[in-house]
Amino acid sequence: MRILKLLELVVKVSLFTIALSSVLLAFLTFRATDAKVEIIRGDHPEIYDDSAENEVPTAASIQREAILETLTNLVLESRTPGTRQIREEKLTIPISTEPATQKTISVLDLPNNCLNASSLKCEIKGISTYNVYYQVENNGVIYSSVSDSAEGLEKCDNSLNLPKRFSKVPVIPITKLDNKRHFSVGTNFFIPESLTQDNYPITYNSYPTNGTVSLQTVKLSGDCKITKSNFANPYTVSITSPEKIMGYLIKKPGENVEHKVIAFSGSASITFTEEMLDGEHNLLCGDKSAKIPKTNKRVRDCIIKYSKSIYKQTACINFSWIRLILIALLIYFPIRWLVNKTTKPLFLWYDLMGLITYPVLLLINCLWKYFPFKCSNCGNLCIVTRECTKVCICNKSKASKEHSSECPILSKEADHDYNKHKWTSMEWFHLIVNTKLSLSLLKFVTEILIGLVILSQIPMSMAQTTQCLSGCFYVPGCPFLVTSKFEKCPEKDQCYCNVKEDKIIESIFGTNIVIEGPNDCIENQNCIARPSIDNLIKCRLGCEYLDLFQNKPLYNGFSDYTESSLGLTSVGLYEAKRLRNGIIDSYNRTDKISGMIAGDSLDKNETSIPENILPRQSLIFDSVVDGKYRYMIEQSLLGGGGTIFMLNDKTSETAKKFVIYIKSVGIHHEVSEEYTTAPIQSTHTDFYPTCIGNCDTCRKNQALTGFQDFCITPTSYWGCEEAWCFAINEGATCGFCRNIYDIDKSYRIYSVLKSTIVADVCISGILGGQCSRITEEVPYENTLFQADIQSDLHNDGITIGELIAHGPDSHIYSGNIANLNDPVKMFGHPQLTHDGVPIFTKKTLEGDDMSWDCAATGKKSVTIKTCGYDTYRFRSGLEQISDIPVSFKDFSSFFLEKSFSLGELKIVVDLPSDLFKVVPKKPSITSTSLNCNGCLLCGQGLSCILEFFSDLTFSTAISIDACSLSTYQLAVKKGSNKYNITMFCSANPDKKKMTLYPEGNPDIPVEVLVNNVIIEEPENIIDQNDEYAHEEQQYNSDSSAWGFWDYIKSPFNFIASYFGSFFDTIRVVLLIAFIFLVIYFCSILTSICKGYVKHKSYKSRSKIEDDDEPEIKAPMLMKDTMTRRRPPMDFSHLV
């Protein structure tokens, strides 16, 4: 009976269970299962349950108290299961809210899962220099977050490399690849915010928004003032900033300074080290950048310490050489005496040194007979020809009193006793170590070691807010009106501003102050503005700013930041502050803001022609063609080269200087931009599974996005069912994936359209000073000379139509690069726009791109292996074209400088013959104009334009008081003349007179008044008016090594002038040949004098000849006529 009752009970329970399951199954067929989102990159899968997170509204209404409503809805929706709505419907957020229902709710009372990461399951997905990208899971829901605080993330997965804190210095992204080398200070995660359907919800510093995540290179941002320094020791400059925190650092272009930014508040002092004064470093502080000028600290210290004493300055500056001379003297006298005295007591030291250096000693002893100065070890001086006695070189140790009859080292006999032993035997070791040559070498090494110890002890040197009327303001970042006593953003308005058609009314809450004023708002602003703060913004800043305020909130207003050094408008300043908040609204505007650079760090050193290092050549002609002298000049097309020509004819008294300087040579490439490619940092996946139906059924809840979509069906069968889903061979899982790109490592791909050889050539001298760009296509021509390029090399391996890559290091790369819209497996995928938006990718993912998993009663998951095309890893196959970084001009062309000759530069100069004749009368100069622009006592100088009319053709010398000129001679033609002249002045030459001396004749001077001088001090960190800087420049100009080198080559100018472009090379060859010739004659003269003195040939001798003796055939004095009958005496004990 008990068994029957038990069976009856089991049957009843089974029937009840089946009935209940049928009811639940019927109910669930009309409901979708919860969706999950999975992010995976590499070995780090991340699973999202987005049934609630995809309902997160945007942050468009945060400025007007809607953040409370948004967070409240977020909590309610995460707890309430509901049907997943279409993405377009989710993005429509009502702006109007009822603030009365929100005032009792505090933001702090609402849960924030991103801030509670320490108590929840979390995982670090990416770490940049200034923030972190992570996910937090709570009740099956995963939230994506980007934060600039590491607090509470220590227990997260992958937190091993997480820093304790991130730097709080403000930064903005760099979009120009050319600027990354100069201003990059690390990376930062940004949120490109937009409301398109391919984006996804994400939280930045607890503020929810919709967008994508992008890793960008960043530069410093902020108001910073750099105080100039006169560079007197200790080379310190001061920086100040009104902001609460600011960053600065010293950076060399291309250097990795990711974690070297120094934060400060208020003011700070920076002392430059000697390495920073090499002319290659820049001081970066906020928006400002300043080039640290090249300064020889050792020289400048000496100039300052021994000012006005040229002898002491010279001794101080050259103290490094004086140190070496002192050590050489110490080694030659006291140290050598000490070593000779301690040779016997320190025999163990020499045995040890001989053992260590035995291979070197063996080689030197065997090759000694081939050395030029081999006899110097015996006390004799010779160059090549003299022979030495073998015993002098090969004497054994003092333990043996006899020398070897024949020196084994120098012997050529094959049956010598020592040849029976190996080179490594003890016999050879004792012989080699104990030769006089080896002992002398070991003593010399000992002396050098002692000298280096002493040398190390010798010192190195001898020596924007918006105001209503009076007290009511709008401050960016605060959604309420505040009073002048503003300290932090309040919870409600502190004042009221009513903008009417004819007047403005202002009132301060809590007081009886009401002020009226005229309506002086910005005109022609047609937009709707209802609240008081909106009306004020429309009135003072305009509708464009109001649109940003309403739709693009500022989470942090940076009220102390004005960005005055960049000259931005109010809208630009607002967008810059949004970038500081980590939000990118528009790539084009971001590119414009990040491309603004305040300071001189990008300024190129426009140096004048370095005449002191250029070769000189004299040209003499007396033939006249069409009334002109024609000079045909050829120069090698090599950057940095040039020649100074001294032009004259047989009748002229003074030569005319004509300088040709090739500033740079390279290839100008015209290109068209194709796309940008970057590595994938991580991947975001969003999918939705259904229990029954197919892909069409799934797409009703998960709409197609247009690219990188996928759908898997069927997904419901036995063994792969979610709870209470019993469908067989039905169901589908559909969704999409989005990549997060590391724009910091992006490459821009260009197609080469055209290549042309160009040269920047500067002409100075009698024609004034001017620089022109000459191409191989069109010859350059003016009234006095013509220039043409004959190229040997055209494009150096870059062919027309080839794809090239401009890398993050500003170098150019070539190789196998994929064409646009070509899915080939070569470098060039993913293909993106500048801001990381895909322009070519897979429309639908294939089966090999992903995998999915399920369980009998668990939820389904999708793993994305490759979201679109990814061939960035093939960049290792690219070849770097040039070692010189390049800059692109408007993404349409670039100049690739070359350091080798590309051909020949041919110049034809036609000078009127009247230039070489004495003028018959004083010329008449009219309509004169001399205007200058530049700085005083600086390397740039004053750039002046001299214009006048002349009634004669002549050559003239020019001068002006207190100024040195780039050229002191001009070729004046009849009629209109225009010259570019650079003047370096110690005083303002305004209203002074420049004097022209026709044909150098001081009796007929012509004066030209300086009409206008505009002084523009360069924005740098050194005061060029410092007397020490002036004295240093004077010292350097007076002690140029290049000037001395040119001076010693000058005797060969006449011969070398016949070799054209090989002028300087021939001078060097002739100088070297002359030096060797002098040494050879000195060697012969020395040998003759020594023999003359040694044999006393200066005494008169008479020889009595004996008739009985046969005639002596050989001379009395012959080599080796006297044979040594005993070994040389040892005097070492006397030393």
Swiss-Prot record:
Give me the ranges of the annotated region Non-covalent dimerization.
Answer: 177-195
| Cytoplasmic membrane side | 367-484, 1089-1135
The entry's cellular-component GO terms read:
host cell endoplasmic reticulum membrane; host cell Golgi membrane; membrane; virion membrane
Q: What is this protein called?
A: Envelopment polyprotein
User: Which residues are annotated as site, described as Cleavage?
Assistant: 484-485
Q: Which UniProt keywords apply?
A: Disulfide bond, Fusion of virus membrane with host endosomal membrane, Fusion of virus membrane with host membrane, Glycoprotein, Host endoplasmic reticulum, Host Golgi apparatus, Host membrane, Host-virus interaction, Membrane, Signal, Transmembrane, Transmembrane helix, Viral attachment to host cell, Viral penetration into host cytoplasm, Virion, Virus entry into host cell
Q: Which family does it belong to?
A: Belongs to the tospovirus envelope glycoprotein family.
